[in-house]
Design a protein with these regions (language model features):
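Short, charged recognition helix plus adjacent turn
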Residues: 9-15, 23, 34, 59-69
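Residues within the helices of the helix-turn-helix
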Residues: 8, 19, 47
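Recognition helix of helix-turn-helix/homeodomain-like DNA-binding domains
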Residues: 26-41
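Residue-level signal for the short linker/turn that defines the boundary of a DNA-recognition helix
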Residues: 15-16, 44
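DNA major-groove recognition helix of helix-turn-helix/homeodomain DNA-binding modules
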Residues: 44-60
Length: 69
């Protein structure tokens, strides 16, 4: 499950908005926020976000033991 707080934190560190991330994964901002709320991203979307946000350990964010919303 996705640790949304860590994802949002990394987005803030890299100064990326939801709209920016929507472009990165090729979706509308509405779809991006819906996917984040539902904690559902496909592997291509995760890969794109990891690359754009320069995430060193994606497991901590995208495969967290506890889900945060």
């Amino acid at each position: 499950m996705i640790d949304v707080n860590k994802l949002r934190g990394r987005m803030a560190e890299k100064r990326r908005s939801g709209q920016d991330m929507a472009k990165v994964i090729g979706k509308t901002p509405k779809t991006f926020y819906a996917k984040m709320k539902a904690c559902v991203f496909d592997s291509d979307e995760i890969e794109a976000m990891v690359k754009d946000l320069e995430i060193e350990n994606p497991i901590e964010i995208f495969f967290a033991d506890e889900v945060t919303r």
